[in-house]
Structure formats: C-alpha cells, structure tokens
Amino acid sequence: MKLNLNKMLLTSAEKRNEETVNQLISLWKTVFGDSEDYISLLVPYLPIFDCYVVKEDGKIVSAFYLLPSEIKVGKNFYKGSYLYAAATYEEYRKNGYMSYLIREAIKDKENELDFISLVPANDGLYSYYSRFGFEELMYNFRTRITCDSENNKQGDIITDGERVNSLRKSNFDYLHLFTDSAMNYALSCYGHFGSHFKVMDDSAVLYIEDEKTVYEGIFSEREKDDFIKLLKDSYSGEITVLSPYSICENSEKRKCGMILDFSSELKNSGGVYMNHTLM
C-alpha cells in the first residue's frame, strides 16, 4: 500500500529555519537522549547534509541525515552518503514512516551516488536494513595488546578533518571515510566526549577513546610491528586497538556496517574498513 505522507527533503532555507532546527533537535533528544549541547554540534553542518523528514500536523515526527562520504578501493574512489541518526517518535512508529523515507532516499540517490552506507545501532537492525538491499560489506579488526610502559606518551591533537583524511587515504587501501567537511563534524562529536586524534610520532596517528582504547592507528600494514612497539612504549595495561587488518594472532575480524552498492563494484572488493561510526 502506498503511503500518502508529507515527505520532505529539507531545502537549504528550511535547514536554516529556527523552528525547523528546534524540531530536529527535539526529535533527536527525545529518541536518543543526548544533550542539546551535543546535538547542536550538528547545526552548523546542516547545510551540507541532506535531511529527510516526515511531518504530521506541521511537526517533524521522523527524520534522518545523509552525510557526504567516500569509499576508497585501491586507487579508486566512490562517492556516497552515510545514513545517520534515523529517528521516529515512539507514538508514530509502526506506521512505515522510516521505511518510506529510506526508500525515497534510495530512489533519489541511486542515479547520483555509488553507494549509501550505514552502521546499525544494534545487531538486530541488520536484518531490517537488509530489506532495502543493504549488505554487510564493512568490517574492522579488534586486537587486545598488553603494554607495560611507565610512560604516557603525549602527542599533538589534530582537529582538521582534511589532515585526518589525508593520513588515512595514504595508509589504507580499502576504507570508508567521510568527506573533509563531514569529518570535521565527526571530530567535533568525538571531542565532545574527550576523544581525539593525536600524532604520536612521524607515522602513527591514534584516535584515543579513553586512553585504554586506541580507536584507530593510522599505519600501513607493513608498519604494524612498529605500531605495536609504539603502543607498548607509550601505555601500560591492556589496550584495545581497532584497525583495518589483523596485526597479531588475537586480532578478531568484526562486522561494522552495511552498504547499498549502486555501483555493483564495491561488493566485489571483499569489503571495506569502517571505523568512524556515527549512529
């Protein structure tokens, strides 16, 4: 049955409208429980993100955002969007609103982009998104390393998305990444919770979640032994590392998101590395 919904892809003017922005913030806060300070980090970036909404009686009741993204496979780059912060008020759920929005976005983007990507908020949602053609094509490796250094090596914090992306592109061959502007938004979100990228030496850049999780080490596969040595010389206790490849015997490969591949080429890559998740 075709739903007769007030579906909107918000225009640039609408994304600058105070009432519209307040409704988006209210929906996010109600569904996800985040603080207004955190949610408001999105506002300056709204002009560069697509926002799909359903309205009932003039009120936004369901919405999600598409963040500009890329996938690198070898020397080739594919243009796409990352589906983010899908939310519907509880009293409006089970009406097909979110499914309708996703299908509309797919129709809008299938001839414009190479892919749409997303990371389900929990494992139970993988089957939901598979209905729309999304496949489990993103992964990362988790490794636990015991370190015994008495040092806590410091580094220079990086806050520029373009620099972070440049480092990632030069070291990783198969990866999902946000565009520079979207990465700046992601960095502001990480920073809100005290996480950041920092240069540890000339070649390794770490995103430290809580000084016990190295959320990402930017290093080429041939440099993995040097990277492990850097960790052991810099931290004490057990450190969890996420990376695009196995770095020792206890590395565990994990699924980390889905791709709707309009290009029909990404699924032949064997999967791409995904780490910088926003949900």
Label each region the model flagged.
Residues 2-23, 152-166:
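A short beta-loop-alpha structural element at the N-terminal edge
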Residues 20, 24-72, 172-196:
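Active-site rim helix/loop that mediates acceptor-substrate recognition in acyltransferases
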Residues 130-151, 215-225, 229-279:
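Active-site/acyl-donor-binding loops of N-acyltransferases
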Residues 102, 109-121, 235-245:
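Conserved GNAT acetyl-CoA-binding A-motif
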Residues 78-90, 211-222:
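Conserved acetyl-CoA binding element of GNAT-fold acetyltransferases
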Residues 135-224:
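Amide-forming acyltransferase catalytic core, primarily the GNAT-like/NAT-type
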Residues 53, 59-70, 80-87, 117, ...:
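Conserved beta-strand in the GNAT
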Residues 85-88, 94-107, 222-233:
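Conserved acetyl-CoA-binding loop-helix of GNAT-fold acetyltransferases
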